[in-house]
């Protein structure tokens, strides 16, 4: 069984943690501020520049929440101090992307261009017409935006065309073999 909930989370320099009543945690750092409401079954404390999570009982559900809470807090601490980024590659003839203000325009081989509204808290850069960098302080939001963009044209297994994560490997298939 994992003991991830028991790890002590080091608070980086320049990061401030506030614990309000009913487990509302606000973490402020150089990149921005994140707030999240956590379960009352988990007690969160700050001691000597460390975040400590303790569970109030030993039920299975509480143990699961303990590890989840610890991981979410670690993500918040990393987000406000360093930030998160996901890189996407676009492969295919005529497939490209461009950022116009708060919209991402994608040409993905459809009869119409795809417009994606960039949500607040996320920044998208088109490094090249075939490379996108999605960055922000909220790990969940950055990952969700990257997944939503990838869903417009997932990589297909025959030629590998589509939108994929930078270090993702596509398992290729062989095409139809000509019959005798």
UniProtKB/Swiss-Prot annotation:
The lineage of its organism: Bacteria, Bacillati, Mycoplasmatota, Mollicutes, Mycoplasmataceae. HAMAP family: Ribosomal_uL6_B (MF_01365_B). Pfam families: Ribosomal_L6. The keyword Cell wall biogenesis/degradation does not apply. This protein binds to the 23S rRNA, and is important in its secondary structure. It is located near the subunit interface in the base of the L7/L12 stalk, and near the tRNA binding site of the peptidyltransferase center. Keywords: Ribonucleoprotein, Ribosomal protein, RNA-binding, rRNA-binding. Part of the 50S ribosomal subunit. This is Large ribosomal subunit protein uL6. Belongs to the universal ribosomal protein uL6 family. GO terms for biological process: cytoplasmic translation. GO terms for molecular function: rRNA binding; structural constituent of ribosome. The keyword Ribosomal protein applies. NCBIfam families: L6_bact. InterPro entries: Ribosomal_uL6-like, Ribosomal_uL6-like_a/b-dom_sf, Ribosomal_uL6_a/b-dom, Ribosomal_uL6_bac-type, Ribosomal_uL6_CS. GO terms for cellular component: ribonucleoprotein complex; ribosome.
């Amino acid at each position: 069984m994992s003991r991830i909930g028991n790890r002590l989370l080091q608070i980086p320099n320049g990061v401030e943690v506030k614990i309000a009543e009913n487990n509302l945690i606000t973490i402020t750092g150089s990149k921005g501020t994140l707030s999240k409401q956590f379960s009352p079954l988990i007690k969160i404390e700050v001691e000597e520049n460390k975040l400590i999570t303790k569970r109030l009982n030993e039920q299975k559900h509480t143990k699961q929440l303990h590890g989840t809470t610890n991981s979410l807090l670690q993500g918040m601490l990393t987000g406000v101090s360093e930030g998160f980024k996901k890189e996407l590659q676009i492969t295919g003839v005529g497939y490209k992307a461009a950022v116009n203000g708060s919209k991402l325009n994608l040409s993905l081989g459809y009869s119409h261009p795809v417009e994606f509204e960039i949500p607040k808290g996320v920044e998208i850069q088109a490094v090249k017409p075939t490379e996108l960098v999605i960055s922000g302080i909220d790990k969940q939001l950055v990952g969700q935006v990257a997944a939503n963009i990838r869903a417009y044209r997932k990589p297909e297994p025959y030629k590998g065309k589509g939108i994929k994560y930078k270090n993702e490997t596509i398992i290729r298939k062989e095409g139809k073999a000509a019959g005798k």
